Amino acid sequence: MREIVHLQTGQCGNQIGAAFWQTISGEHGLDGSGVYNGTSDLQLERMNVYFNEASGNKYVPRAVLVDLEPGTMDAVRAGPFGQLFRPDNFVFGQSGAGNNWAKGHYTEGAELVDQVLDVVRREAEGCDCLQGFQITHSLGGGTGAGMGTLLISKIREEFPDRMMATFSVMPSPKVSDTVVEPYNATLSVHQLVENSDETFCIDNEALYDICMRTLKLNNPSYGDLNHLVSAVMSGVTTCLRFPGQLNSDLRKLAVNMVPFPRLHFFMVGFAPLTSRGAHSFRAVTVPELTQQIFDPKNMMAASDFRNGRYLTCSAIYRGKVSMKEVEDQIRNVQNKNTAYFVEWIPNNVQTALCSIPPRGLKMSSTFVGNSTSIQELFKRVGDQFTAMFRRKAFLHWYTGEGMDEMEFTEAESNMNDLVSEYQQYQEASVSEGEEEYDEEAPLEGEE
């Protein structure tokens, strides 16, 4: 069956990854040590997308855990699902990358990368028909960003025809851990544009907003944020892991979502999101789910899609959902919001259904959107990058690891190109021969 090999790099990647494995182990009826004690055959049917079967009814994740310092790994190992992972699949250095992209990409990370690739190769050889790789990492740090992108390009060389999906945590405007985030993120985006097939953009600030506004948590922890991310990751891969009426896999998702190869940065959302106390006051229905996933407040990237237009989007519904109802709701959304969908891609919403809901819910839905408003995210990082780069602030940390200023300039211009490509398609109309008219103006009045 169509297996996926999962990599998690850096502290952020490992923590999101751990939450993801916890979520899908629960969905497949595995306990903390990987022993199956589920209730339904459906849980077993496609277990091998993410798990290898070992002896004694034990299942082992196809996960490779990478970090340049041992701390995070120890935390994962000591966590509730620490016994799940194969001990050989922990690959870690001792030095740490110190939030320095150059260390992760060129010096420290480059020394460790062959070791990681050996493990990846071994996992890939254990697959019948490998579908692709998914990697969780953040773009603001050193290991996840620098070494993560190095791994992506190396895996790309070795498995050119396999899908590469990344779940990338973008630096957010208000929640910043390090000063050099804009540098690290710009250098990473420069790599992702070239080497990834689909990048799901997640951003801490948007996750905080969801926790505070929708889930009514007063001081959300990283655990709460990671739980949200793992819900989306589980949703995106549902169709691979359970039989459904209308299935989708990484490649189908990419074919439907990526109109131009460089524009593969998606916004994601999840529904139902309700605060713990309000569960009993709401019925989860298809219209309710559809309204929630198209609500800007539920997007896990801090950019408002009302400032742009959707090129394409995909909605994945789980649970006992009627096909017709989904179609009607989606058509309804498109008719009401025609201004937010480009008219030169008709039927640009793809739907997928899976009959098995996540634990504890009757139905749920996951949203993936390719919207031109994602450019706000890149613009924001780009402005911060330019401000520092103009003064050459902090550059010596990077040049000291053997980087060249040229690389920074290239990365900056590549990201600016990406922004202008998004802008160009946002303004494009069906009849390109006509004069370009400014479509942004009428949207202001609607708010």
Curated annotation (Swiss-Prot):
Protein name: Tubulin beta chain
Organism domain of life: Eukaryota
Organism: Dothistroma septosporum (Red band needle blight fungus)
Region of interest called Disordered, as start-end residue ranges on this chain: 424-447
Coiled coil: none
Binding site for GTP: Q11, E69, S138, G142, T143, G144, N204, N226
Comp. bias intervals (Acidic residues): 432-447
Gene that produces this protein: TUB1
Keywords tagged on the record: Cytoplasm, Cytoskeleton, GTP-binding, Magnesium, Metal-binding, Microtubule, Nucleotide-binding
Gene Ontology biological process: microtubule-based process
Cofactor: Mg(2+)
Subunit structure: Dimer of alpha and beta chains. A typical microtubule is a hollow water-filled tube with an outer diameter of 25 nm and an inner diameter of 15 nM. Alpha-beta heterodimers associate head-to-tail to form protofilaments running lengthwise along the microtubule wall with the beta-tubulin subunit facing the microtubule plus end conferring a structural polarity. Microtubules usually have 13 protofilaments but different protofilament numbers can be found in some organisms and specialized cells.
